Amino acid sequence: MSQQVIIFDTTLRDGEQALQASLSAKEKLQIALALERMGVDVMEVGFPVSSPGDFESVQTIARTIKNSRVCALARCVEKDIDVAAQALKVADAFRIHTFIATSPMHIATKLRSTLDEVIERAVYMVKRARNYTDDVEFSCEDAGRTPVDDLARVVEAAINAGARTINIPDTVGYTMPFEFAGIISGLYERVPNIDKAIISVHTHDDLGIAVGNSLAAVHAGARQVEGAMNGIGERAGNCALEEVIMAIKVRKDIMNVHTNINHHEIWRTSQTVSQICNMPIPANKAIVGSGAFAHSSGIHQDGVLKNRENYEIMTPESIGLNQIQLNLTSRSGRAAVKHRMEEMGYKDTDYNIDHLYDAFLKLADKKGQVFDYDLEALAFINKQQEEPEHFRLDYFSVQSGSSDIATASVKLACGEEIKAEAANGNGPVDAIYQAINRITGYDVELVKYDLNAKGQGKDALGQVDIVVNHHGRRFHGVGLATDIVESSAKAMVHVLNNIWRAAEVEKELQRKAQNKENNKETV
């Protein structure tokens, strides 16, 4: 009987480090819910000691997620571990993941310490974490460049201290697959108490072999794989979980292991992460790229038509990609839209049917037929923008031409007040942004602008993703419309609402901190 490989997702911790703009607490929760639906065993959702905002988001996710184990990261520092436990304690069960560097280079130049001191510190911190939970994971940072004998000493001591998962990271993506397999095998040979812990791996893609390293480690005995959806992460990224999961499934004949992942949710989870994180998936990306199941060669097309297995080792349906696209019209009722969303795998909690149906009718009136990809895009945008809005686009008009300076007039609802402004700009989008900035008085600098078609043909929806810099912080906004200028305006309004909400959250955190201080003084 095959053994289970535990899937540990770090999209919301290590993966987020690659983003140009930090995710809001609501966006993180959306991703966490998608990961739970896909069936990840463990999700690492943040580094609570790093900021009050991260603490709050970890706490919110820990309170909400029920079917996956929620985990938080902590250095081998007392405060880190205590704060992580404080954020996680609202969960029924949780994991604390603590780490310290073990390679000679890191010990000498970063920690300015010795291996013996590192072991002593690791043991103390694992024991401290065990005071809060039985589920403690310990990582040997830069394990890939740590001599195996040294690594074995650290691992044995951490297990004796109470760590139930030992993670072996290739922190800088340096190790080759055969080397990494050798490290795992070497630990099994050298560590007498290794049967008391799960051996985990965490690989990076600097040399393009993160997935290969993880699979080689599993073949050598590792039983947990850490990674991120779509491989997002620092530098060249993390191990792409969807690739590991499907490799284990497709090649079960030689891997002889399995995961508990609902692989039919892979495609939708991948899309959720891509859209929320504003990181488009390359067309040639394995498993989830738009070209992953495309066949352009005549020979291949003929072979697939005769038997799909001639050129397909897995099906689009196996990852939840339904290739049958149905269309709805403005005559389709609310029940028909809801039924189609259910057929595509969406639950009632994934969208607001009232908001979705209103947006559907507006789009159907414009383009006649609404396809599955239109519905999914509308559902995503409405989910992103369902929170109370301080700013709302009331009206806009643009005049521009090949030789004229673009002029825009904009009306914006700011709370209960309607404000209007006009401005010139270098093109219609810039003119609208100048007018909006005049209305709000927000000092924002546009640092990224992306336009992607959601669908096919001249009436396809255009999704605009922007990133702006505001007082040293970056914020992401998204807009969707059949008109590019309108979607650009909506994206800017979305950004401004995100900035406004972030300021409100900051005020609330400051209020709580002040109340805490006042209570201390009273006592």
Swiss-Prot record:
Segments for region (Regulatory domain): 392-523
Domain Pyruvate carboxyltransferase, first and last residues per copy: 5-267
Subcellular localization(s) per the UniProt record: Cytoplasm
EC number: 2.3.3.13
UniProt keyword terms in alphabetical order: Amino-acid biosynthesis, Branched-chain amino acid biosynthesis, Cytoplasm, Leucine biosynthesis, Manganese, Metal-binding, Transferase
Gene Ontology molecular function, alphabetical: 2-isopropylmalate synthase activity; acetyl-CoA C-acetyltransferase activity; manganese ion binding
Superkingdom assignment: Bacteria
Catalyzed reaction equations: 3-methyl-2-oxobutanoate + acetyl-CoA + H2O = (2S)-2-isopropylmalate + CoA + H(+)
CDD domains tied to this protein: DRE_TIM_IPMS
Pathway recorded for this protein: Amino-acid biosynthesis; L-leucine biosynthesis; L-leucine from 3-methyl-2-oxobutanoate: step 1/4
Names of required cofactors: Mn(2+)
SMART domains listed in its UniProt record: LeuA_dimer
NCBIfam families (UniProt xref): leuA_bact, PRK00915.1-1, PRK00915.1-3
Protein's job: Catalyzes the condensation of the acetyl group of acetyl-CoA with 3-methyl-2-oxobutanoate (2-ketoisovalerate) to form 3-carboxy-3-hydroxy-4-methylpentanoate (2-isopropylmalate).
Subunit structure: Homodimer.
Name listed for the protein in its UniProt record: 2-isopropylmalate synthase
Organism: Salmonella newport (strain SL254)
Gene: leuA
